[in-house]
Amino acid sequence: MSVIFTFGLDQLRRQSPSKTRTYDNGFSLDGANGSTVILIHGLTGTPNEMRFLANYLNKKGYTVVCPRLANHGESLSVLKHTKWQELYRSVRDHADVKKALAGEGPVFVAGLSMGALLALVLADELKERITGVTCLAPTLFYDGWNTPGAKYFMPLACTPIKYFCYFKEEPPYGIRNEAIQSRVHKYYSNASFEHMENVAQYGYPFYPVTQLYQLKLLVRYLSKRLTRMKTPIQLIQAKDDDMTSIKNSKYIYDRVRSDIKEMIFLYNSYHVISVDQERDIVAEKMEGFFSRVKNGGKS
């Protein structure tokens, strides 16, 4: 990741709404087996990155709800002021999520990257209602092989300078599949603060450093609660994750007190495992986990 500073430019406030507001409003798919899966996309990502998993699970009979996180699709000048609590509430208070929670059937929650942490917060707050949780490439720390500079900018994230700093996404963009990576690169390499028309499909090409600070606050909040969590949990991550090392999954696995817990590693993917080369395996492992949990942990 490279870093961009915008001191004195205030470029983001001059963006045209027609070029910066491009929404993927999320989606809901009705199923027939009485169970619901809530999918949470990653920070600066889009519900589109969860669509393959959603379609797979829906074909297995699950109702699937995938909200758009708060302020995703807005300009970076809006997104950079978003608190992690707003992101969380945009999931918890989503109409279809509330409908599922008010029902009687099993409710599972799965999240990608920072979305995995929001899934854990939901499982902790609604422990009596959440049947199981899946964490896909959970991101507590940016310590992957393609994010060597992230730790050096954490001190910046704790100062007002954070409002003027952005990480620029760089290859491989969390994706090992060359065809998908090429499509993302075509968009990201030509994107600027003024032109982000494909945010709804590919997510933001820039990552506000303010959100690095929000991640720190979220991790601080969640770390105090992991040791009391007993909800069945599944963690899936690529061994070669370019954004976050497998230490992230191990950190969670070692602290939760769930009787049913499993950690699965992939060997031909990078960070965004919901769309990468082993997405079929991810979908199968998720559905198998949900089925076992509904069956009392038995295969």
Task: Label the predicted regions.
Residues 262-299:
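Catalytic active-site module of serine/aspartate enzymes centered on a nucleophile-bearing elbow/loop
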Residues 114, 121, 125-205:
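Alpha/beta-hydrolase-fold enzymes
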Residues 74-108:
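Catalytic nucleophile-loop/oxyanion-hole region of alpha/beta-hydrolase
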Residues 22-24, 207-225:
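Active-site nucleophile elbow and catalytic-triad environment of alpha/beta-hydrolase enzymes
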Residues 229, 235-237, 241:
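Short beta-strand/loop motif that positions the catalytic acidic residue
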Residues 53, 231, 245-254:
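Short alpha-helix in the alpha/beta-hydrolase fold that links the catalytic acid
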Residues 240-244, 272:
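Acidic catalytic loop of the alpha/beta-hydrolase fold
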Residues 54-76:
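Conserved alpha/beta-hydrolase
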